[in-house]
């Protein structure tokens, strides 16, 4: 299993994880990152090219998969970013509270055990009014698609490092104490609907007066 996890899975993610519709959304939301950035689940490093090096001082990367880290380091060398890969000892993020300007998560919250507690930990390291940028997939709004998601979830969990396609990501983000201030959603081609319903947007750790929701075309 370690061979698949570290030698096969990272290349599978690199091959499948960034088709044009997804890449275009990365290009839109990741330049919003600024200051000290914490990215959870760096994957193969496809986000690096979308950070603005004139706005981002440093990127801390949490990635438990050594195979992913090797691919991400190849991408890091192509940028002008200052990047530090950090370990996750236990469940405690090894950064001081209130020190991070931006937290980034792309296609990671579906895999984390105890995801609400993990999100609370991310909220703690954010500075007051720091920003959480997310781009995730999960539970579709259509009942017929949800049925297929529940049937397919065991396969997703096996093939994609514990991926849960039945998670309601906005609800989990809110449960952790974040306030979503911008969100868009929709099915993203070319993947089947059982795995392609996504949300992308931003949230803050303190309550805001309002939020706006935009429905993307399906």
Residue ranges and their predicted role:
Residues 16-36, 46-50:
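Conserved alpha-helix/loop element of class I SAM-dependent methyltransferases that forms part
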Residues 38-40, 44-92:
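Class I SAM-dependent methyltransferase SAM/SAH-binding core
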Residues 88-103:
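A short acidic, Gly/Pro-enriched loop at the edge of an enzyme's catalytic core
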Residues 101-115:
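A short SAM/SAH-binding and catalytic strip from SAM-dependent methyltransferases
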Residues 116-128:
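A short glycine-rich, Lys/Arg-flanked "PGG" loop and its adjoining helix->strand segment in the class I
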Residues 129-137:
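Conserved beta-strand signature within the Rossmann-like core of class I S-adenosyl-L-methionine
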Residues 161-177:
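Short alpha-helix
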Residues 178, 185-218:
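Core SAM-dependent methyltransferase catalytic element
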């Amino acid at each position: 299993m370690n061979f698949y996890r570290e030698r096969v899975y990272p290349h599978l993610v690199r091959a499948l994880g960034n088709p044009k519709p997804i890449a275009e959304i990365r290009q839109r939301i990741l330049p919003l990152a600024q200051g000290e950035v914490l990215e959870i689940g760096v994957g193969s490093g496809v986000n690096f090219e979308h950070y603005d090096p004139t706005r981002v001082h440093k990127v801390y990367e949490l990635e438990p998969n050594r195979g992913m880290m090797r691919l991400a380091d190849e991408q890091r060398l192509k940028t002008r970013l200052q990047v530090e890969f950090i370990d996750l000892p236990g469940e405690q993020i090894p950064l001081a509270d209130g020190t991070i300007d931006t937290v980034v998560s792309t296609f990671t919250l579906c895999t984390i055990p105890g995801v609400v507690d993990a999100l609370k930990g991310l909220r703690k390291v954010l500075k007051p009014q720091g920003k959480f940028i997310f781009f995730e997939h999960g539970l579709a709004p259509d009942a017929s698609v949800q049925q297929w998601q529940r049937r397919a979830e065991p396969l997703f969990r096996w093939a994609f490092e514990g991926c849960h396609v039945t998670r309601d990501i906005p609800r989990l983000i809110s449960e952790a104490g974040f306030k979503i201030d911008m969100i868009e959603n929709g099915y993203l081609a070319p993947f089947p609907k059982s795995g392609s319903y996504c949300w992308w947007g931003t949230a803050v750790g303190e309550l805001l007066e309002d939020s706006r929701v935009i429905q993307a075309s399906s």
